[in-house]
Amino acid sequence: MEKTQTPSLTPDELSARSSTPFEEREEEEEVHYVGHLKFSFIFVGLCLSVFQVALSLQDIGWYGSAYLFTDCAFQLVFGRLYSMLPVKIVYLGALLLFEIGSIICATAPNSIALILGRTIAGIGAGGILSGALTILSQSVPRAKVAVFNGILGAVNGIAFICGPLLAGGIINGTTWRWIFYINPIISAPTFFITVFLLKLDPPKTNVKTWRGRIAMLDLPAFTLFLGSILCLILALLWGGKEYSWKNARIIVLFILFGVIMLAFMLVQKRKGDDALVPMRILCQRSIAFGMFFSFCTSGTGFILEYYLPIWLQVIKDLSVISSAVKLLPIIAAAVVFTTLCGILTPVIGHYVPFMIIATMLLSVGMGLLSTLEYTSPIRHVLGFQVPAGVGLGCALQQTLVAAQTILPMNDIPIGVSLIVLAQTLGGTIALSAADTIYTGTLSSSISSRFPQINRETVLTTGNREIRNLVPAESLSVIMDLCNKAIVKTWYLSIGLAAASIIGVLGMEWRRVTPPKK
């Protein structure tokens, strides 16, 4: 079998290499960077592609699960593709798949077609964010990558949080199909900019034949990874809803997830550098601890951004659009500090300080939100969002900067895909756990306090309609129960935010810029 040119470095050797002077590293890699004007257009295109993908994270049920399944599963495949094929071709392929999936959704005659469209769109999404970051790492010097990462992170955050607001406006003004029709419109400039302006050096590899490249994709291992992620997504989708968490189906799915994932890891270890994910990259200290940090902080962010609007809708009886407007403090804080961290990281020379700040402020912000009562004024909600938003802004891009700083150029796509995978899985698993806490607490407490209302009624009632289950004189009681159920989900996010300190402590302190002479 043909071998890649990437040397078989151990995780420790990778760490040692990252301390090599920046001038020497960039000379060794012989990178040819894009001109300023051309890069400006390319960067706008990258922002548009990231924006449309973040907008698509708002789906629920099978539609969202099909998307998340393929998004997670294909992260590693795209990481390997970017490391051995021209980045431009792979990135355009990911964009094309995402748009094909969106068009299928927009024209879907039934639910099956919609699920199929979301599945295809998820495959494309698996390569868009990691592709944008890979293009960045090859378009500007390493010392400047953090700045543009910060801007991309800000765009990603704006799109994710503003998704409900935009979707609500589209649905109120026209058909829901325009939620999907809008994606090809947003993507068109990116596609043409990439085709005509993007020119990058091909990855350094000895694999010249298509047979060798297909072998490097490690399809048997990918099948194992695909199966393990499918078991996990199904268990999270069905658990506590279709079946109880103690049901044999759910238990078997979790066991299968663990067994198949273990088999995948053993195959990766045996295949060395020919693996889909070489263990020397996965076990590299900053990558491993960075994945843990990203898992925890992403989980915290997903819970916050999902249940804070629910609190506003249920407790304060706000519409979807009004509740989205009340999220402006967290949007502003996250956007400003994501960008600011990107600017300051090269100035300070390290990314770890911002990770420390992120852990502290996320924990404080979620702690403050957990003190809310159903009688709390809106101004408390607005104020408590700020430290959490600052923490999210500081956390979003730092582990990606670490991967782009520490790894050799040809390994960056795989390292970035691992970090993005950890972020996606962290949000998926945390939201599922929070949903179990919320629905379980709310249904049991309401059924206990109001015996005439059974559990199934609570679970099938919309968030804003819960207040209609009881007479007006009992409204304060049910609002108190709803508040306590939502606050319990924030206890989980406090735990995740606090646990992220483990990831911080494990990170290497490596410079992102050359030391001043």
Swiss-Prot record:
Question: Which keywords has UniProt assigned to this entry?
Answer: Cell membrane, Glycoprotein, Membrane, Transmembrane, Transmembrane helix, Transport
Please state what is observed when this gene is inactivated. Does not affect production of fellutamides.
The question of whether Membrane is a record keyword is answered with: yes
GO terms (BP aspect): transmembrane transport
The record, for Gene3D superfamilies, names: MFS general substrate transporter like domains
* Described function: MFS efflux transporter; part of the inp gene cluster that mediates the biosynthesis of fellutamide B, a mycotoxin that acts as a proteasome inhibitor. In the first step of fellutabmide B biosynthesis inpC activates 3-hydroxydodecanoic acid to generate 3-hydroxydodecanoyl-AMP that is then loaded onto the T0 domain of inpB. The 3-hydroxydodecanoyl-S-phosphopantetheinyl-T0 is sequentially extended with L-Asn and L-Gln by the two CAT modules of inpB. The linear lipodipeptide from inpB is then transferred onto inpA for the addition of the third amino acid, L-Leu.
Xref: PANTHER family: MAJOR FACILITATOR SUPERFAMILY (PTHR23501), MFS EFFLUX TRANSPORTER INPD-RELATED (PTHR23501:SF199)
- Name of the protein in question: MFS efflux transporter inpD
Gene that encodes the chain: inpD
